[in-house]
Amino acid sequence: FEDLSLGLSESMSHTITDADIKGFAELSGDRNPIHLSEEFAAKTFLKTRIAHGIYTASFISALIGMRLPGPGAIYISQSLFFRAPVRLGDTVTAKVEVVELMAEKCRARLACACKVGDEVVLEGEAWVKVPSRLPRPEKAA
């Protein structure tokens, strides 16, 4: 917790592949044909397959768990607003930024967003419990 400050941010990018979409469908059990069937998707207003929204959101989880705050961080809550679809071949850039710190509870509020190019496709906020550095035991003289 002591290493966090307002405005601190981290980001990562990932290009969505067919294997990503199929793998997430298998893991999650969400086999909605909008994700898996070009024939089905072509008949919808979207005209093509899209990635699962929660798969896109998982990049935020990866940032929180691995980079900011990082290992040991525990989700308390997450709000998500899906603004636009993510398609096969899109490169998603996820970003989290510290916008509030609650020192007494070792909690942080993070603004979260995913973009494809300049378009925000997902946004929201997360509250996380952040590990505090434990005091080091004093060495015996």
Model-identified regions with their sequence ranges:
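HotDog/MaoC-like acyl-thioester-processing domains
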Residues: 1-6, 86-141
